[in-house]
């Protein structure tokens, strides 16, 4: 659930709550939906504006054709790569790239990134076949992650295309994760698997992620579609 709130630091403030009631710092898919909501319901006439989140101030830009929002490009800011800032236990200020993590008796290679929230990226041979339902919770609550973690299981198709499935902290398996897609794009570059611009295929659709070398900012572009409207009773 997303809340639209006033901000003294940005044009708007966004708060996010997971299905288990916990509050998240950021949601990449959420901020695209948030941006479209502001436009469609007349809360802003701007095509680009600032949003205060738990991960800092982010800048969505609406892509509009014939008066309709066709997509949203979001400047997601700089990725955080230092272990203790993500946080991941035992790495201090070092980066966590292709480091061992043992889950249920098997060792995997993890690359960890924060996009305002923690992510553990695991590259796998076959994303469809990976037992995400059996192992996802064990990654999320692993002792290496003091604030738990989101975990992305990623199959590299080529240097511009990856297939990603995600176990989200506080929400389990979801159809897509915007910050997870950004973390995946960064991890692909850090491990030499992908280019700086990559298409991420998720269960719920596709996102384009670009880690800009000049600014060190990550840009995410994707759709935001109206599914339904409703009212919550008092």
Predicted region positions:
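Membrane helix-loop-helix hairpins that form the core translocation module of multi-pass transporters
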Residues: 71-73, 77-79
């Amino acid at each position: 659930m997303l809340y639209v709130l006033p901000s003294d630091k940005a044009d708007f403030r966004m708060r996010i709550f997971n299905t288990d009631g916990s509050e998240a710092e950021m949601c990449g898919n959420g901020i695209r939906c948030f941006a479209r909501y502001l436009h469609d319901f007349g809360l802003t006439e701007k095509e680009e504006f600032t949003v205060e989140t738990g991960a800092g101030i982010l800048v969505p830009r609406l892509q509009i054709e014939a008066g309709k929002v066709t997509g949203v490009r979001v400047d997601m800011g700089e990725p955080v790569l230092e272990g203790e800032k993500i946080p991941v236990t035992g790495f201090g200020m070092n980066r966590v790239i292709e480091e061992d993590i043992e889950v249920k008796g098997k060792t995997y290679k993890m690359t960890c990134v924060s996009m305002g929230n923690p992510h553990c990226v695991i590259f796998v041979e076959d994303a469809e076949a990976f037992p995400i339902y059996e192992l996802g919770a064990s990654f999320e609550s692993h002792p290496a992650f003091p604030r738990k973690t989101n975990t992305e299981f990623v199959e590299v198709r080529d240097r511009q295309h990856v297939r990603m499935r995600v176990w989200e902290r506080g929400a389990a398996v979801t159809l897509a994760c915007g910050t997870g897609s950004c973390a995946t794009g960064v991890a692909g570059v850090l491990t030499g698997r992908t280019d700086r611009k990559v298409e991420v295929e998720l269960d719920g659709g596709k996102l384009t992620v670009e880690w800009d070398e000049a600014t060190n900012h990550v840009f995410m572009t994707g759709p935001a579609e109206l599914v339904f409207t409703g009212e919550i009773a008092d």
